[in-house]
Amino acid sequence: MAAAVPRRPTQQGTVTFEDVAVNFSQEEWCLLSEAQRCLYRDVMLENLALISSLGCWCGSKDEEAPCKQRISVQRESQSRTPRAGVSPKKAHPCEMCGLILEDVFHFADHQETHHKQKLNRSGACGKNLDDTAYLHQHQKQHIGEKFYRKSVREASFVKKRKLRVSQEPFVFREFGKDVLPSSGLCQEEAAVEKTDSETMHGPPFQEGKTNYSCGKRTKAFSTKHSVIPHQKLFTRDGCYVCSDCGKSFSRYVSFSNHQRDHTAKGPYDCGECGKSYSRKSSLIQHQRVHTGQTAYPCEECGKSFSQKGSLISHQLVHTGEGPYECRECGKSFGQKGNLIQHQQGHTGERAYHCGECGKSFRQKFCFINHQRVHTGERPYKCGECGKSFGQKGNLVHHQRGHTGERPYECKECGKSFRYRSHLTEHQRLHTGERPYNCRECGKLFNRKYHLLVHERVHTGERPYACEVCGKLFGNKHSVTIHQRIHTGERPYECSECGKSFLSSSALHVHKRVHSGQKPYKCSECGKSFSECSSLIKHRRIHTGERPYECTKCGKTFQRSSTLLHHQSSHRRKAL
């Protein structure tokens, strides 16, 4: 193999990167081992750092360097280049370990080993790691956050690459060397990391051209109009947040790939809605929206998810291991994006405003879901009955009606529910909690909806009418059940005795006759009842409450049925 030699400039003059660069032909490069190639990259990087730190022009020789950056120096690379009659072998003792090496290149490679050990030592525990990437991975265990900085080692060195010159050099944390991060050589492959203990210098400049740098030091732009949209990708915590779905990323490349799913026309099209994806796996995940398939169930609460990552984040709710904690209230979250959304609740920030009704939202996807109320769009369709929904969660809840799935079970009585909110409301029957108070009469309710229906008793409002007989009702559900009297429909049948009922609640109450179950117990005397309404009526014996008053004579009663019987006596007297 022919000896690869650098170009030799004059003994005294301006030094360029090409003067100290060592070039190999394609055939020569193929003969080098991996270790030799790594050494070559290390030497070239060191030469680049030296030239840059001295302020020398790093472009091609036929380009004119800026006068401010021209400097006359002795050739530093002569110690690395064998000259006629001078042997390259010389004793080079290592100051770190005392090892003596004869070859200057081996000596440089050996010193780099100590340098790596120093750079790859964990500041928290002192542990040495083999590679910078391993160090970054290890540091996550201490700080509990994701971060990503691409290694300068991955940079590709290109012949005669035109490089810009910085007024003052930046310091790359990976190697601790002065390098031009804005140069074409390093700008695309490395990101500058700024820590509290490091002092960063001014932004790079090119003669006759203004340069704009992103505040996060991860990307440089040639115009101010280019940097402003880029900065909007960041949150105040340095996290990339998708404006379409709210998902957050610590790496720009992951964020960019994710956004491609929202915007780019990929080769994988959804047959249901026509949406395109760049990856087949993304299409498969998306199709679960239409099918309602949830492949990853939570063993703690039974809730299912279409993506494994969503399940892992959800499980942190049960374990309480959320690494992202709100400084205002101390609440922890499994994802940084969820913390950011939560913090907007403290600040009151609502960036998304509906032009139709003026309602505001903190999250864009909530705003999009709300807009479907005005547009009538229902993209989520049930495969069983064809019913469509505006939100995915409503489709999942609806499908449980077909499958009979009731994942939320009461530990007190064993009753199961389709929705967690229904379980929470049901548990108040056992605890006696009634958080909703009527301002008119002081009556308490365990559900907000029951309070709203009750308030119509005071206002006299009955907004729901039967289309057959015109009877008015205070809630829509009562109209639906009433209309079955006209149609004769009794869809709920008892499997024990075959008796049919108008409503599912009536069937559930009836089943307690066969099971003997009496879940509602009086705290005063210990008597148990199969129906909640029976317990309420019984309690009036202890409290003395008589809420039903006769308008004719003013007499009061504990039960409405007793009042009706009493009123009939007035009618008989009138006859």
From Swiss-Prot:
InterPro entries: KRAB (IPR001909), KRAB_dom_sf (IPR036051), Znf_C2H2_sf (IPR036236), Znf_C2H2_type (IPR013087). Residues 69-88 are annotated as: Disordered. Residues 71-81 have a biased composition (Polar residues). One of its GO terms (biological process) is regulation of transcription by RNA polymerase II. CDD domains: KRAB_A-box (cd07765). A zinc finger (C2H2-type) spans 92-114, 240-262, 268-290, 296-318, 324-346, 352-374, 380-402, 408-430, 436-458, 464-486, 492-514, 520-542, 548-570. It comes from the Eukaryota. It is found in: Nucleus. Pfam families: KRAB, zf-C2H2. Residues 15-88 form the KRAB domain. May be involved in transcriptional regulation. Belongs to the krueppel C2H2-type zinc-finger protein family. This is Zinc finger protein 587.
